[in-house]
């Protein structure tokens, strides 16, 4: 059985073996095939769900699939906001590829993916100007609060660090404003529907 084999070769060897397995197919190709088979003009959320189950059951690299799923629960996008199933499928592919990446590369890939740009509104984010426009702070706030350092400084034990009985904030409003300035200018080339360019 699989469990007996893991016991025999050891956890470290099994993990290395799992991440060396090639990804058999992409969610994007599975979603497009599913939509085409059902006679749909585009892919929808149910096609993405079908793809996720297909890969979860059939992919030999089960560890990669499970890590990608766990990452999708942290770096959340919505098929309600991102209305093209190809976008969500491509996003799952990106998480699958980066399942064993370092955190810096993963966070960059998440930040640059159009699905996240649409969901947390930094796609097309513009710099401040003289009219009073300021950069959208939504993604910057989520990067700090949910995707990295969190609201409060923590001890090595994971408990909140206290100073004079009070928790210590890890960032403030000025930090968010500064980071929001970094996340401006992201956009994309949107080819026509007949274009061969794969824009997801």
Which residues does each PLM region occupy?
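Mature N-terminal segment immediately following signal peptide/propeptide cleavage
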Residues: 1
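Active-site substrate-binding loop specific to GH73 endo-beta-N-acetylglucosaminidase modules
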Residues: 4-37, 44-53, 84-200
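Amphipathic interfacial helices
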Residues: 44-48, 58-66
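Short, flexible active-site-proximal loops enriched in glycine and acidic residues
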Residues: 63-67, 79-87
């Amino acid at each position: 059985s699989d469990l007996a084999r893991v016991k025999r070769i050891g956890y470290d060897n099994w993990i290395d073996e799992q991440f060396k397995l090639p990804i058999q197919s992409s969610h994007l190709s599975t979603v497009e095939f599913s939509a085409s088979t059902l006679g749909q003009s585009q892919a929808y959320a149910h096609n993405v769900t079908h793809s996720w189950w297909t890969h979860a059951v059939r992919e030999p690299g089960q560890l990669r699939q499970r890590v990608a799923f766990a990452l999708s629960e942290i770096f959340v996008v919505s098929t309600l906001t991102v209305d093209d199933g190809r976008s969500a499928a491509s996003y799952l592919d990106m998480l699958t590829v980066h399942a064993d990446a370092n955190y810096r590369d993963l966070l960059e890939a998440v930040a640059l993916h159009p699905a996240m740009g649409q969901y947390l509104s930094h796609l097309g984010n513009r710099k401040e100007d003289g009219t009073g426009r300021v950069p959208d702070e939504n993604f910057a706030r989520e990067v700090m609060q949910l995707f990295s350092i969190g609201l409060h400084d923590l001890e090595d034990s994971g408990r909140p660090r206290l100073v004079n009985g009070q928790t210590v904030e890890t960032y403030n409003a000025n930090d968010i404003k500064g980071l929001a300035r970094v996340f401006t200018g992201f956009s994309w080339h949107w080819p026509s529907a007949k274009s061969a360019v794969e824009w997801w």
